Amino acid sequence: MEVCRCHHGYLISLLLFLFHSETACYPLGKRPCEMQAFRIWDVNQKTFYLRNNQLVAGYLQGPNTKLEEKIDVVPIEPHAMFLGIHGGKLCLACVKSGDEIKLGLEPVNITDLNSSKEEDKRFAFIRSDSGPTTSFESAACPGWFLCTALETDQPVGLTNTPQDAVQVTKFYFQQDQ
């Protein structure tokens, strides 16, 4: 019986091709992954919704549950992604204004963003999973994390003190069915 003598690189490539993860898509030239919708809520069970063109986190009940915003995701690297809402037409961005850094919503089509363009880096977030929860760090502003306030119906923002007890940086992040 003759043993196949192929390079390990080919075997590894074949295995990666056969057993890839949808949430860890990797671009090969043009981005092969399509936009996916996710539900997001913080560890205090506050969901995201839009109020006066601002993304806020609060407790939605009864008929208000339909106001929940799904997060549109386009993976750009194994743990980096563009985040948007409204079918990917409004994108979350790390906005620098002087010494201030804040979360913004910009009217940009998420599928038009390009991870190799420096000006699009502000829309990229790095996903870190820790058990059942996920945190999102800005790629453009390292050390700044997506956060919610402890109080309900407050704007979703960014913080550079993720261990601070007045900000929530841990989220449940689940693909929408």
From Swiss-Prot:
It comes from the Eukaryota. GO terms for cellular component: extracellular space. GO terms for biological process: inflammatory response to antigenic stimulus; negative regulation of interleukin-1-mediated signaling pathway. Its main location: secreted. Residues 1-25 form the signal peptide. Disulfide bonds join 91-141. Glycans are attached at residues 109, 114. Pfam families: IL1. InterPro entries: IL-1_CS (IPR020877), IL-1_fam (IPR000975), IL-1RA/IL-36 (IPR003297), IL1/FGF (IPR008996). Keywords: Disulfide bond, Glycoprotein, Secreted, Signal. GO terms for molecular function: cytokine activity; interleukin-1 receptor antagonist activity; interleukin-1 receptor binding. It is found in: Secreted. Anti-inflammatory antagonist of interleukin-1 family of proinflammatory cytokines such as interleukin-1beta/IL1B and interleukin-1alpha/IL1A. Protects from immune dysregulation and uncontrolled systemic inflammation triggered by IL1 for a range of innate stimulatory agents such as pathogens. Belongs to the IL-1 family. This is Interleukin-1 receptor antagonist protein.
